[in-house]
Each structure stands twice: as C-alpha cells, then as structure tokens.
Amino acid sequence: MASGDTLYIATDGSEMPAEIVELHEIEVETIPVETIETTVVGEEEEEDDDDEDGGGGDHGGGGGHGHAGHHHHHHHHHHHPPMIALQPLVTDDPTQVHHHQEVILVQTREEVVGGDDSDGLRAEDGFEDQILIPVPAPAGGDDDYIEQTLVTVAAAGKSGGGGSSSSGGGRVKKGGGKKSGKKSYLSGGAGAAGGGGADPGNKKWEQKQVQIKTLEGEFSVTMWSSDEKKDIDHETVVEEQIIGENSPPDYSEYMTGKKLPPGGIPGIDLSDPKQLAEFARMKPRKIKEDDAPRTIACPHKGCTKMFRDNSAMRKHLHTHGPRVHVCAECGKAFVESSKLKRHQLVHTGEKPFQCTFEGCGKRFSLDFNLRTHVRIHTGDRPYVCPFDGCNKKFAQSTNLKSHILTHAKAKNNQ
C-alpha cells in the first residue's frame, strides 16, 4: 500500500504557518482491515522486513516514509505486540518513540493545502485524492491496541473518541457511531477538531465502509447512506440483523412447491388480511439442489433480506443507493442506468424480444415478459399451490397469488 508519492501530514507538535491553520473539510471513510499491512517496530528481526517494505539497505523508511535508518536501532528495547490493522510510523522526535501512530485513510473531495496528490495510492487502491494522516495515539498507557479504529472512523458525526496527542499537535475527533452525512474537520496546528453538520435541507448520499462480523469471520462492505435519519445508530441495526433468529423466515419457498405444514406457515396467519397480503407479495425464489442457508443479512436499515454469501449481499446492497438515473419522459428514477434504459423501451414502443415458437412471433419490450410468455408454449408451470391437498400449478406467480386468496376466503367462510 505504501508508495513513493504518499503524503504524510505530521502532527507531532511542529508549528505550521498561520495561513494553513484554518479548518479544511475532509470526508473520512473506513477501509477494509485486510488492505492495511501490520508492521511491528522494535524487534531485531524486523530489520530484514524493512527491505521488503521498500526501506532499502540502510533501513530508511522507503515508500514515502523518509525516516533515517538509525531510528530503528533506538527502538529495540521498546517491543510492543503487533497492532490490529494499524501501521506504526516512526517519528523524527526521539522523545516520541513510545507512541504508536495510527494511519487513517482519508478521502478528500477538495484540495488540501500544502501537498501533492498521492497518485500511487490512487492507482493501487481505487480511491481518489487520498492522503495518509498519522494521528498520534493517546498517551498514557497500556493501551497498545486501538480496537475497531477503522470501523468507528466511518463518516463520523458524533463528537467523542480520542486521538488527541500529548505533544500538542492536531487531533481528529472520531465518532463512535455510523452516522453519515456529517463531516470531520481536521485542524492543522490548532490542536482541535469539531464535528460540523451537513446542510439539513438537502438529502445527501455518501458511500461508507461498514465492518460486518458473521460466523464465518469478518468482512467489509461499501454501502450507501443518506443523512435523513441522524438519530439512528447504525451499528446496532447491523448487529440485530446479522443474527439469524431476529430475521423473519423466508416464506417465498412455499410459492414454488413446498407444502404448508399442518398448522399453516409458522408465524403467518393467512386468515388475517394484512398477513395474507404480505405473503402474496413475496417473490418466489429459485430452488437449487445445493441450496445453502442464508446467513448474511443486508446491513441497510429496514431491509430484512438474507443472502448465502458476502458477494450476493454486496451485489444487492447498491440497490439501496440514490436513484440518480431519471427518465426524461415520466420522471421515474432508477438506481442503475441499465434499468433506466430498459424502462425507456416502454416510451419508445420498441419490442426487441420476439417469441420464436412457430406460428407465434409475439414481441415484448422486456426479456422477462418474453420468458413468462414462453411458458404458455412449453407448459412449464413452476408456481405450485402450497396448500395441502391442492396440486394446482401456474405459469405466472400472479396467478398463484390470486389462487391463494381463494383458499383464504374459503377458510374464512367456514
């Protein structure tokens, strides 16, 4: 991850010119823990690792570190256990050797005074306009592990958290929650930072990384969030939804062949019109031979969908983003440009999908409609009534839903 173009802004008490003491607005975004290399300063064997990290033969901190090699020898008696997902940096001030400095990856949207763009980082990591800002860890103790730093920095809005330096340099306030739409402000030499608010009138969307723990381990996802509901602590929402018991069971399997148990569907009373309507709205899911359990929950607030693996969940997650692709004809908005293009066929009257069965030739604007139509010819009826003793099958899910209502009405009339 280190590169020759990386810019470091030191906060070790060095004075800065008055004209760049003003607050610069930056957006802080967490990154997956896997992408940061953990290094330990202080062991004899560590000298060999310097060459691998781009340090060269004289133990200089190559790749943008630029520290003299002899500092490594001052540190041999300061042995600390490795920090999780943090990269310690050696300071030029010998009095500061016992302080670890954590690296925060910052994604900026505007020019930061006093530095070049870090092009090397941009190429490797896929971020734009990044700088690395070492923030001295709080002095005072045994606290060698700074846990969850990468998670709690995300789009921080709550004021709180430490990172203040004993040497009187700058500090970054880190919020504990996952609130979005707020900005963190970094003050170069003033030694203080405050959380400002975003414009309350505008609904702002931004992407942020969220750390998710599952039984299989931890992983990180990028998700969209708007600043509409600032009073929600996102972290608690994620924790609640990941636990399988708290998520509603997936009843859609009853739409394609699984029969209802004798007592009806657990948790659903089909004689209640509201619950029945909810059941009828469920989309059928394709049954696979190797159907793995769905243990990964969508972390978006209010979404109860479950997925078999992380990649499926990530693919779904972007659907919660802002609908920025708007149809000029009717104003309908879509998350993806491809969905807008497909929708525009409705206005153009274009029907590119044609039934190839002999003597038919019907045309459709959407491939989905053609697939549904073809079942008329093939006799494929995948939607099976879930009620015991009823073996009716249907080519379209809407027909099955209408049929289910007849069972419910008959039950109510008894």
UniProtKB/Swiss-Prot annotation:
It comes from the Eukaryota. One of its GO terms (cellular component) is chromatin. Zn(2+) 4 binds at residues 385, 390, 403, 407. There is a cross-link at residues 182-183, 208, 230, 286, 288, 409, 411 (Glycyl lysine isopeptide (Lys-Gly) (interchain with G-Cter in SUMO2)). Changing residue 339 to Q: In GADEVS; uncertain significance. Zn(2+) 3 binds at residues 355, 360, 373, 377. It is found in: Nucleus matrix. Residues 116-260 are annotated as: Gly-rich region involved in interaction with HCFC1. Transmembrane segments: none annotated. The record marks 119-120 as: Cleavage. SUPFAM superfamilies: beta-beta-alpha zinc fingers (SSF57667). Residues 257-341 are annotated as: Involved in nuclear matrix association. Zn(2+) 1 binds at residues 298, 303, 316, 320. Residues 57-66, 158-170, 188-199 have a biased composition (Gly residues). Residues 371-397 are annotated as: Involved in masking transactivation domain. The modification Phosphoserine is found at residues 118, 187, 247. Residues 33-81, 157-203 are annotated as: Disordered. Gene3D superfamilies: Classic Zinc Finger. Residues 67-81, 171-182 have a biased composition (Basic residues). One of its GO terms (biological process) is cellular response to UV. Multifunctional transcription factor that exhibits positive and negative control on a large number of cellular and viral genes by binding to sites overlapping the transcription start site. Binds to the consensus sequence 5'-CCGCCATNTT-3'; some genes have been shown to contain a longer binding motif allowing enhanced binding; the initial CG dinucleotide can be methylated greatly reducing the binding affinity. Proposed core component of the chromatin remodeling INO80 complex which is involved in transcriptional regulation, DNA replication and probably DNA repair; proposed to target the INO80 complex to YY1-responsive elements. It is linked to Gabriele-de Vries syndrome: An autosomal dominant neurodevelopmental disorder characterized by delayed psychomotor development and intellectual disability. Most patients have behavioral and feeding problems, movement abnormalities, mild distal skeletal anomalies, and dysmorphic facial features. This is Transcriptional repressor protein YY1. It comes from Homo sapiens (Human). The gene is YY1.
